[in-house]
């Protein structure tokens, strides 16, 4: 189908699925687990690593301080997202360093508790190197859970339907970088950075809850806000989802737009 409109993609560029181990960060008495890069779930883990230094529960949930720390933690995490997140098969990503307690504290210390910073930069490491998403979660009486998310990107994806097959091809290749020095630069057989991130919360080594949401770069921000709503403010899942939230929309190449 895509060859009919002049695409250079061929069968060698086909998708290959793989099993991966989730990456987890401790928060209060639970663990937040996300998929590793090439997705943005890592940003939620970085936000948690930063926010665990804030002791948010000492403020009411709607206190401006809580919104301030959430917004600044997101900005810090997304600076690293734009610099480092890519397909780990093609780039050396400092995953351990990005999630270390020392680095989380270092990034937290950059936050001015009284004012938003004009700008942040990504961390430096000495190493070389729109409504289009559906989320589904299900659990059974035995505690088995599935956390599933899918998206064609850009609403109708590529707009191309393989003849006779009845589904739309996605176009997430848009999220490759065109900068040849960037770890997420496009390359044959390479997976682009993407935003779709199913999540789990673990407790004592066992799954406690599967969850996720839609909304591009809102997703890691939403994961973190669900986590603090439940485990800093004692909300149940319904209350955590209904609560007010902050979101700062970020594109790798476009200005940031923040909303509450």
Report residues per predicted region:
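Short, small/polar residue-rich loop motifs at catalytic or cofactor-binding pockets
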Residues: 19, 130-133, 194-196
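Glycine-rich phosphate/pyrophosphate-binding beta-alpha loops
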Residues: 36-41, 149-159, 213-219
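Internal maturation/activation junctions in enzymes
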Residues: 53-152, 164-165, 172
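Compact, glycine/acidic-enriched structural inserts
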Residues: 237-252
């Amino acid at each position: 189908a895509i060859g009919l409109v002049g695409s250079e993609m061929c069968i060698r560029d086909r998708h290959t699925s793989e099993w991966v181990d989730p990456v987890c960060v401790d928060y209060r008495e639970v663990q937040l687990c996300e998929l590793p890069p090439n997705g943005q779930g890592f940003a939620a883990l970085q936000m948690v690593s930063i926010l665990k230094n804030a002791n948010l529960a000492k403020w009411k949930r709607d206190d401006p301080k809580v919104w301030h720390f959430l917004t600044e933690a997101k900005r810090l995490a997304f600076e690293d997202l734009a610099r480092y997140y890519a397909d780990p098969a093609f780039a050396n990503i400092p995953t351990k360093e990005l999630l270390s307690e020392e680095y989380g504290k270092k990034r937290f210390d950059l936050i001015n508790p009284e004012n938003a910073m004009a700008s942040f930069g990504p961390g430096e490491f000495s190493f070389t190197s729109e409504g289009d998403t559906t989320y589904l979660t299900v659990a059974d009486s035995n505690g088995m859970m599935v956390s599933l998310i899918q998206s064609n990107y850009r609403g109708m994806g590529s707009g191309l339907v393989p003849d006779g097959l009845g589904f739309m091809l996605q176009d997430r290749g848009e999220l490759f970088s065109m900068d040849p020095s960037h770890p997420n630069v496009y390359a044959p057989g390479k997976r682009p950075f993407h935003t779709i991130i199913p999540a789990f919360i673990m407790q004592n080594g066992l799954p406690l809850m599967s969850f996720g949401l839609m909304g591009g770069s809102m997703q890691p921000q939403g994961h973190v806000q669900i986590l603090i709503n439940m485990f800093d403010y004692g909300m149940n899942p319904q209350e955590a989802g209904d609560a007010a939230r902050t979101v700062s929309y970020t594109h790798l190449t476009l200005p940031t737009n923040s909303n509450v």
